[in-house]
């Protein structure tokens, strides 16, 4: 693509426009940065800089200066937004560089930006791209042991064991070799680093493939950056997992096939055969690594026969590819060879054909494949695939990907089958697959999608450039926007990295459990936490006396399995630690004690305080004596975070039935800003009860009193201890981003506002502020914006504004903050009239302000109320991982938007005129703990978010 410098009309007036826009832009930026005393001062500054800019740039041809016109996007923008201003500057600079570089190439060589597919021309930039992303991944790498499958891979790679089906033998051998080459780092870090290398190589291969397809470097760079900075790809490239290697083999297969086509089209059959054999080798290795790449192999075969239909009749030419493919399958021999080894995951069944095939083909998961095939469910899953893509890529990149898909089907059918077919088949298979890792299973589709991005950018801009002076400008503008969109992902998606997302959370959790487990105890664990526990035991040698057991479903309800396993283990005379938190007290088991986020059923009664407790002597309501407590994070908490305090107590006398304890968080203004209630379950000795109370938004900074009381008692609550409320280091999510700097002496800037209308006939306004010490939120209930008394702020061009307006969302909409930085933004179904048996889809929308590494379940109920409007006559419950399992909260990063669809049905017993309501909660899939709803108005009525106010139709026959 070539951007002509002097292709635009250069009339005497038009040539002043870029300088005028630049001057106006600078005047606005200067005014908003330093402030203006009034409107006329801003007008004077704008006129002065506008005239100066127009005069200054008019000396150059319009073909050189027109990119400054892009800045008009911010000149006309209706509010102060420094981030948008910087994006406009970035697009302008990129457009200017594109024009200048194109002019220099044209002036010196008379060539376009196309390059030949020579190996040096492609390999050196590809190596640079790969090394750049390797550096990015190393700097953002997870520092050590991880949870769930990642933890398992770190163990079995260190031991040369066998992973869960399909086994991943090639991955394990390569990761183990990587450990041997890096003896100075921990095994866990080495496996994480192997993912970084595989991810960086995949990005480099994508660059080469995109250059082969387009003949241009820039689309290749953009495709590589788009993939390397995609949310899930970045996450997988900085943690131990099999997906980075899957991406590498997908990229290598696509590269080899595109390279093969170049030779076949050129008529070089010998080169074509060699490259086809290379593709077959990559296919063999890919299938050895992960059987899901079979779908890419099938697409590749169709592509080959489209390129060379005569291959169907040339059996001799298939000898080399078949041999190469078989060679790629040789790593599968690892499984039977390790069948008898005394390592994790090994089984003698792997040395038998049935056991080998069952493991390699992962037949235990066959019930999940093509699970969502019913039309209604499949349609919902396809909608979710759109959400999956917006979860990964900037919207401008997605637009050009769609454009590339359309253009390639019009112009290049074989390439359309290869790239478009790969994207489509993996999207459809992922849409029908029942598994909570859809965002990861789509990785081969992401590789194909960025190649479509490269094709779409190259083809569309080349087509525009054919229109001469009227096309080169738009082509440059589109290229600049897409370039900035791709590189901006590096900034926007940093929270997806292993360092920011996972960090040391798995080690912290596992070390706490191992440190708190009594000698000879058993830890019953979810898979998520079992693997880091095993790693610390088997690789680092911690607490070999503790038996860590994975609790898997056994046909009964999962909760029943947990309860039975806990009782059986306790009956055998061993203390039991469980990562499962029962929903009700367990009869026949002692009162549990907290161990981190888990609980311990001890064999012996506690007689003294654990280490780290503060001694106390506090009587509460003549019912319990508090003898000590431990406050987590005593240096302070921010609004939205949990205050975690463990209280050691004993009953004064026998406890009354159904008595409970509570903790209240009270601010300096005497207002209650958080609470947690727990049943009072006492044992023979000291009882330990852990309270987790989340602070509501709007909690004022300063002293926070932690009070304890007995439920149902008229005796006042007692002060247990105090802590400090500080500003948050993380910006809250806001639907309506603004930038309003106050003109008073403070450094406060309003960065966003949100209205909530979830409660009937009620409204709430959230104002989100940033200051030097962090972020805080103010909350105003049932108030009009005009009634707020706020100091003037700096508006557009820095002009003071004294009248505050918050128009967006003032009449409708939802904004309910939850724990972990999650915000519920709808939807509700008010006013519906339904018939018995009717099914409706309730779409729930969530946003996240920060990375989340807990797995939350979205629970939606449709409830038919009794005539009293309180009790339930019937209900339909639908619990699932968000987005029908496609986008778990474990994968959410800062700024994530996730839509979760839930189909609920009106019970056949519903009566005409019956009132219907809905309920939404989120709870931890591992601990059963409900995620806090940080709206005291909602919690005062019910412990859930109300989803609808509807009725059953009265015209039922």
Please tell me what each predicted stretch does.
Residues 50-58, 193-214, 252-256, 451-455:
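Transmembrane-helix motifs of polytopic, lipid-linked glycan transferases
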Residues 243, 294, 301-411:
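Transmembrane-lumen/periplasm boundary regions of multi-pass, lipid-linked membrane glycan transferases
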Residues 18-22, 409-412, 455-492:
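Signature aromatic-anchored transmembrane alpha helix within multi-pass, membrane-resident enzymes
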Residues 57-71, 206-229, 248, 266-270, ...:
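Transmembrane-helix signature of polytopic, membrane-embedded enzymes
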Residues 511-534, 540-957:
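C-terminal luminal/periplasmic domains and tails of membrane-associated envelope-modifying transferases
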Residues 27-41, 72-84, 172, 184-192, ...:
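Aromatic- and kink-enriched transmembrane "portal" helix at the membrane-lumen/periplasm boundary
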Residues 54-64, 211-217, 253-278, 285, ...:
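Membrane-interface transmembrane helices that cradle and orient dolichyl/undecaprenyl
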Residues 70-80, 156-159, 223-228, 251, ...:
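Membrane-interface alpha helices of multi-pass inner-membrane proteins
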């Amino acid at each position: 693509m070539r951007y002509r410098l002097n292709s635009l009309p250069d009339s005497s007036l038009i040539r002043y426009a870029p300088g005028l826009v630049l001057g106006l832009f600078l005047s606005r930026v200067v005014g908003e940065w330093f402030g203006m005393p009034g409107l006329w001062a801003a007008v004077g500054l704008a006129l002065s800089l506008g005239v100066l800019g127009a005069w200054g740039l008019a000396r150059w041809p319009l073909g050189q200066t027109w990119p400054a016109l892009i800045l008009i996007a911010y000149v006309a923008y209706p509010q102060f937004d420094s981030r948008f201003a910087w994006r406009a500057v970035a697009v302008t600079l990129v457009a200017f560089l594109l024009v200048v570089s194109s002019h220099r190439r044209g002036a010196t060589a008379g060539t376009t930006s196309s390059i030949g597919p020579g190996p040096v021309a492609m390999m050196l930039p590809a190596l640079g791209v790969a090394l750049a992303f390797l550096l990015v991944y190393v700097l953002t790498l997870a520092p050590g042991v991880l949870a769930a499958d990642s933890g398992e891979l770190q163990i079995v790679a260190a031991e040369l064991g066998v992973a869960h089906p399909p086994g991943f033998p090639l991955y394990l051998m390569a990761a183990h070799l990587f450990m041997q080459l890096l003896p100075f780092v921990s095994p866990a870090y080495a496996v994480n680093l192997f993912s970084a290398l595989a991810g960086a190589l995949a990005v480099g291969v994508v660059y080469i493939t995109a250059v082969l397809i387009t003949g241009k470097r820039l689309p290749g760079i953009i495709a590589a950056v788009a993939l390397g900075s995609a949310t899930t790809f970045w996450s997988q490239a900085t943690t131990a997992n099999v997906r980075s290697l899957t991406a590498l083999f997908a990229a290598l297969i696509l590269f080899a096939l595109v390279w093969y086509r170049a030779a076949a089209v050129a008529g070089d059959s010998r080169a074509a055969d060699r490259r086809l054999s290379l593709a077959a080798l990559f296919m063999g290795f890919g299938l050895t690594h992960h059987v899901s790449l079979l779908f890419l192999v099938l697409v590749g075969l169709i592509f080959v026969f489209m390129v060379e239909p005569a291959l169907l009749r040339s059996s001799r030419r298939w000898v080399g590819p078949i041999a190469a493919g078989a060679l790629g399958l040789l790593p599968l021999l690892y499984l039977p060879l390790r069948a008898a080894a005394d390592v994790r995951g090994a089984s003698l069944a792997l040395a038998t054909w049935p056991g080998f095939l069952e493991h390699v083909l992962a037949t235990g998961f066959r019930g999940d494949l093509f699970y969502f095939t019913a039309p209604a469910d499949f349609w919902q899953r396809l909608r979710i695939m759109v959400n999956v893509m917006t979860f990964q890529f900037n919207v401008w990149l997605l637009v050009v990907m769609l454009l590339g898909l359309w253009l390639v089907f019009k112009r290049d059918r074989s390439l359309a089958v290869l790239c478009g077919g790969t994207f489509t088949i993996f999207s459809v298979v992922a849409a029908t697959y029942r598994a909570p890792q859809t965002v990861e299973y789509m990785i081969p589709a992401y590789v194909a999608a960025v190649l479509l991005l490269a094709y779409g950018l190259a083809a569309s801009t080349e087509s525009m450039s054919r229109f001469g002076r009227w096309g080169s400008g738009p082509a440059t503008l589109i290229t600049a926007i897409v370039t900035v969109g791709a590189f901006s992902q590096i900034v926007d998606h940093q929270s997806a990295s292993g360092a920011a997302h996972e960090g040391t959370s798995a080690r912290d959790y596992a070390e706490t459990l191992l440190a708190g487990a009594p000698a000879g105890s058993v830890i019953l664990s979810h898979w998520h936490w079992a693997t880091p526990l095993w790693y610390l035991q088997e690789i680092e040698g911690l607490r070999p006396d503790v038996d860590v057991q994975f609790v898997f479903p056994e046909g009964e309800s999962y909760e029943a399995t947990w309860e039975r396993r806990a009782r059986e283990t306790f009956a055998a005379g061993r203390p039991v630690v469980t990562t499962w938190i029962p929903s009700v007290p367990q009869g026949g088991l002692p009162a549990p004690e907290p161990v981190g986020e888990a609980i311990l059923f001890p064999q012996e009664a506690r007689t003294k305080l654990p280490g780290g407790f503060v001694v106390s002597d506090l009587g509460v309501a003549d019912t319990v004596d508090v003898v000590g407590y431990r406050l987590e994070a005593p240096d302070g908490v921010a609004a939205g975070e949990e205050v975690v305090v463990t209280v050691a107590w004993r009953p004064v006398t026998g406890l009354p039935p159904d008595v409970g304890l509570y903790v209240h968080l009270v601010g300096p203004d005497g207002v209650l800003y958080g609470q947690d209630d727990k049943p009072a379950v006492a044992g023979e000795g000291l009882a330990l009860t852990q309270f987790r109370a989340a602070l509501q938004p709007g909690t004022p900074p300063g002293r926070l009193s932690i009070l304890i009381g007995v439920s149902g008692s008229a005796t006042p609550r007692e002060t247990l201890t105090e802590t400090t409320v500080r500003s948050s280091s993380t910006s809250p999510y806001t639907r309506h981003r603004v930038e309003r700097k106050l003109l008073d002496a403070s450094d406060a800037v309003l960065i966003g506002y949100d209205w909530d209308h979830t409660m009937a006939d009620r409204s709430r306004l959230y104002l989100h502020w940033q200051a030097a010490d962090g972020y805080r939120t103010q909350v105003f209930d049932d108030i009009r914006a005009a009634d707020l008394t706020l100091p003037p702020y700096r508006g557009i061009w820095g002009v003071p504004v004294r009248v505050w307006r918050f128009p967006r969302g003032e009449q409708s909409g939802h904004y309910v903050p939850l724990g972990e930085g999650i915000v519920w933004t709808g939807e509700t179904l008010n006013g519906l009239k339904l018939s018995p048996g009717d099914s409706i889809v309730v779409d729930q929308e969530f946003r996240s302000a920060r990375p989340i590494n807990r797995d939350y379940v979205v629970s939606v109920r449709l409830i038919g109320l009794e005539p009293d409007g309180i009790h339930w006559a019937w209900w339909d419950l639908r619990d699932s991982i968000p987005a029908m399992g496609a986008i778990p909260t474990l994968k959410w990063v800062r700024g994530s938007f996730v839509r979760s669809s839930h189909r609920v049905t009106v019970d056949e017993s519903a009566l005409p005129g019956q009132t219907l309501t809905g309920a939404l909660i989120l709870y931890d899939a591992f601990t059963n703990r409900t995620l806090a709803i940080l709206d005291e108005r909602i919690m005062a009525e019910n412990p859930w978010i109300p989803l609808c106010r509807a009725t059953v139709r009265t015209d039922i026959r």
